[in-house]
Amino acid sequence: MAKKTKKAEEITKKFGDERRKALDDALKNIEKDFGKGAVMRLGERAEQKVQVMSSGSLALDIALGAGGYPKGRIVEIYGPESSGKTTVALHAVAQAQKEGGIAAFIDAEHALDPAYAAALGVNIDELLLSQPDSGEQDLEIAGKLIDSGAVDLVVVDSVAALVPRAEIDGDIGDSHVGLQARMMMQAMHKLTASINKTKTIAIFINQLREKVGVMFGNPETTPGGRALKFYSSVRLDVRGNTQIKGTGEHKDHNVGKETKIKVVKNKVAPPFREAFVEIMYGEGISRTGELIKIASDLDIIQKAGAWYSYNGEKIGQGSENAKKYLADNPAIFDEIDHKVRVHFGMTEDDSPVQSELVEEKNEADDLVLDLDNAIEIEE
């Protein structure tokens, strides 16, 4: 019985060695035909963690789970009219430029306001802008930019405005059933692999439509067919909530609106998280406002009555004064922002303030050494 078991083990080992050799030969042939890295063991990948780029909003980064938009993936931002979709996308553009990247904006709606984009922090002199005439042209331009590997972020505004050439050339009233959906499906087939390979973030802004005859359930849907829904790694539902009243002489005027951003699909972190942000008219997302709220909830900023304090120092009476303090003191803003991100595991605990102190100390030590050397030379 023991002999039989030993023989069976030898046969199994021999069979296993043959299979491994066959697999190695197959991998070599695939690599020869399709290039290095066409097939690899997951453990051999240099980077297994998904790389992200901040959305430009701390609250949204937390809701996304990974700390921002995943690189090499497709993101869809949709919602009702004037809900803040383009604002959210423009903050991503500003963030990409802030990190030294190149961003492109495909303006299919022909409605981008350069002054508003600049107010949100976008460097309009460096922004690549395209306003094509048809949906096919929009997507071809986006594809060429992505294929170049030189662009970090591409925003398409919006999918609903990607009108097929056949519809543009036709007469009003002509039926063009499924043309846009077919165009989007073909675009997703072509773009997805290139987006992943070049680590480009592709943001598609979309509108809402109502399904006719729906009696039960949600009648809302997005145009462009189902392809974008399937290929998107992240889908954000942006909804404006209540209006924000001004203070002082502007107390009777609406100066912004509270906006809810729900992550309805997320392939890199748990979905269905929500972010609540303040979108101020003419300014975009209030980064100081969201930081004060989140840091206060974590007790990084202490609140006693109407006063806000940080590290034992009062920074303002009322949220508006606290916002002004953080806006006037960017170093304190960055320090608090870093602590919040460390708390949520979005960055390692290497305080930028501490790093600056170490750098200053090293510069001081170098200066002392230079002075000592100068004294020795004189002697």
Curated annotation (Swiss-Prot):
GO MF annotation: an example: ATP-dependent DNA damage sensor activity
Keywords, sorted A to Z: ATP-binding, Cytoplasm, DNA damage, DNA recombination, DNA repair, DNA-binding, Nucleotide-binding, SOS response
Residues engaged in binding ATP: 79-86
Any single biological process term in GO: DNA repair
Signal peptide region: none
Record's subcellular location: Cytoplasm
Coiled coil (UniProt feature): none
Matching InterPro entries: AAA+_ATPase, DNA_recomb/repair_RecA, DNA_recomb/repair_RecA_CS, P-loop_NTPase, RecA-like_C, RecA-like_N, RecA_ATP-bd, RecA_C_sf
Gene3D superfamilies listed in its UniProt record: P-loop containing nucleotide triphosphate hydrolases (3.40.50.300)
GO (cellular component) term, any one: cytosol
Summary of the function given for this chain in its UniProt record: Can catalyze the hydrolysis of ATP in the presence of single-stranded DNA, the ATP-dependent uptake of single-stranded DNA by duplex DNA, and the ATP-dependent hybridization of homologous single-stranded DNAs. It interacts with LexA causing its activation and leading to its autocatalytic cleavage.
Family statement drawn from the similarity comment of this UniProt entry: Belongs to the RecA family.
Name of the protein in its database record: Protein RecA
Organism encoding this protein: Streptococcus agalactiae
Highest classification ranks of the organism: Bacteria, Bacillati, Bacillota, Bacilli, Lactobacillales
